Amino acid sequence: MLPYATAAEAEAALGRAMTAAESLWFRYSAGIPDYVLFWHNILFLFVVFTLAPLPVALLELRAPAAVGPFKLQPKVRLSREEFFRCYRDVMRLFFLVIGPLQLVSYPTVKMVGIHTGLPLPSLGEMAAQLLVYFLVEDYLNYWIHRLLHGEWGYEKIHRVHHEFTAPIGFAAPYAHWAEVLILGIPSFVGPALAPGHMITFWLWIVLRQMEAIETHSGFDFPFNLTKYIPFYGGAEYHDYHHYVGRQSQSNFASVFTYCDYLYGTDKGYRYHKAYQAKMKALGQTEGEKADSNGLSYAKLD
């Protein structure tokens, strides 16, 4: 809740006139408690989990021939019932774990210094903070994800997420409840190290989940803008990890690829890409053995 009763008081405190964005923020948030503003994340996550995967899912279900050339595992076709079951299970997880976690997290958010006041951050400041959040979360997520591929972590927790060997967007948050709690920690570390405005935090949560949904989409569209982000993994990169499954010691990265490269956990993927290029050059001769999903992984690592 902003400590100003009127716009004039806010401008007096700022020592200048509010920008259009600040005026809009003042009108919306002045009378809303900070914890309620933070709880907006619950609504944002619900909308993202429900709507962001929907366009690709509808294309896959209603126009499979049109999007078939871009599907990473073309022989895997999920039914409408399987899509709905995934969404239903994600919503159960959302209402029992993710939503309640947001409700009780506000004291931590307040403690680290995420604020709702004026002035609003500049676009440059927001971009810099978001970059920090992505880099920090990606690094920590890499190591936690790698640990979850140990025997105990996989069998007890992470195997749930890998039930979808050919991932779909709705399956991005599909996981064991313990994994949701564990992997939620890296998402808060970046904002704790570089605390910013609540709007930046909202944007971070939304962008991170949309990135995860894109990565799990199961499609590699040539027009995707993420292809222009340096070191970005994307759907094709992460699809390999899901296909190989438990035995995979490759492609642990959640967003960028630098950790896999630095720590040598992309060797299987690079071998696979080299093998694909070789087979393509040979015209996909009989030496290539494709699996039932339409893929040809010569080496699983």
Curated annotation (Swiss-Prot):
InterPro entries in alphabetical order: Fatty_acid_hydroxylase (IPR006694), Sterol_Desaturase_Related (IPR050307)
Domain Fatty acid hydroxylase: 131-265
UniProt GO MF annotations: aldehyde oxygenase (deformylating) activity; C-4 methylsterol oxidase activity; iron ion binding
Primary location class: endoplasmic reticulum
EC number of this enzyme: 4.1.99.5
Topology term for the membrane: Multi-pass membrane protein
UniProt-annotated location(s): Endoplasmic reticulum membrane
Keywords annotated in UniProt: Endoplasmic reticulum, Lyase, Membrane, NADP, Transmembrane, Transmembrane helix
Residue ranges of the TM segments: 36-56, 94-114, 187-207
A GO CC term assigned to this protein in UniProt: endoplasmic reticulum membrane
Catalytically driven reaction(s): a long-chain fatty aldehyde + 2 NADPH + O2 + H(+) = a long-chain alkane + formate + 2 NADP(+) + H2O
Enzyme superclass (EC): lyase
Summary of the tissues where the protein is detected: Expressed ubiquitously.
GO biological process, one term: sterol biosynthetic process
Recorded family membership: Belongs to the sterol desaturase family.
Quaternary state and interactors: Homodimer.
Function as written in the Swiss-Prot or TrEMBL entry: Aldehyde decarbonylase involved in the conversion of aldehydes to alkanes. Core component of a very-long-chain alkane synthesis complex.
Protein name: Very-long-chain aldehyde decarbonylase GL1-10
Encoding gene per record: GL1-10
